[in-house]
Structure formats: structure tokens, C-alpha cells
Amino acid sequence: MAKRRKGNREKEKETTWQERVIQIRRVSKVVKGGKKLSFRAIVVVGNENGQVGVGVGKAGDVIGAVRKGVADGKKQLIEVSLTKASSITHLTRGASGGAQVIMRPAAPGTGVIAGGAVRTVLELAGVKNILAKQLGSDNPLNNARAAVNALETLRTFSEVAKDRGVSIEHLYT
């Protein structure tokens, strides 16, 4: 009986996570007997409350690739510090491969102004007001990783105040 309850708790924890597939691509590998086909899935996992991760999964079928992508995304979760207006604390940039992403905080009511994979990452991270721009590449995997890289570099108000040696109240005066 105790095992069953524990399993239910684990399922409840899993239901708080949302996952969105960014891309499914059929890929092939040349082997001695010809071409071996498989699928690659790029998946973003987040709880819309400050945690997000990007995962990649490969398998012989689409469902298996998505499942592996979700597992990989949960291994690569990051914490995102958000303001009371559900925006980011300061301007930030991120890069991965040839992709670059610039993110700027926005006023309440602005919404998520971003495109493609970056928009998906921001929505699943719980960001509600932000301006973002993709530069350099239209590759969904590199853009998603660049967005995560940009969110990783964010610092909270308390971290900035501590580095400057002032209190949070005196940070902007």
C-alpha cells in the first residue's frame, strides 16, 4: 500500500511539468546494409514557475524520441529569477553555436514578444513580459540553448546588491 502512494506522489510531481516539442526530425545513419532511419526530438520542459530545460532525444520512433527528450530536459533544468511583473531582472544575452539571443525586461501587459524556440523556452520558464530577439541562426536547437544560456546569466536583485555592498532598498536610489 505504501508503494502505491509513493507512486501517486511521483505522478503528481510529474504533472506539474509541461513539455513542448519544438522539432521532430527524421535523421539517417549510413550503415553496411543501407540507411538506418531514426527520429530526433527537441523538447522544452518547464513548470511555468522559474524552472526550464531543453532536451534532445533520439529513437527509432517518435514517441520514444520525445520521451528521451523529456528525460534529457529534466536533467538540464535551470532556475530563472523573475520579477513581480513576471519579467527578467535585467538585459541579458546568450549564445549557442551560431545563434545569439538578446532579452530585455518589459513592462506588465507587454506579453512575450519573441519567436520560435525562444518563445517556447520563455513561456515554459514562466516569463510573462519580455522582449527577445534571435540573431545569427534559425536553428531551433541552438536558439533554444542560447535562450537557456541567456536565462542562466540572470542575477537577482539581492545578488547585485550584495556584489555592490549596498542594501536592496538603496540599489536604485
Curated annotation (Swiss-Prot):
GO molecular function: rRNA binding; structural constituent of ribosome
Name of a matching Pfam family: Ribosomal_S5
Single GO biological process annotation from the record: translation
SUPFAM superfamilies assigned: dsRNA-binding domain-like, Ribosomal protein S5 domain 2-like
Domain S5 DRBM, first and last residues per copy: 17-80
Keyword Calcium found: no
Keyword Ribonucleoprotein: yes
Annotated function: With S4 and S12 plays an important role in translational accuracy. Located at the back of the 30S subunit body where it stabilizes the conformation of the head with respect to the body.
The protein's name in its UniProt record: Small ribosomal subunit protein uS5
Organism: Microcystis aeruginosa (strain NIES-843 / IAM M-2473)
Protein encoded by which gene: rpsE
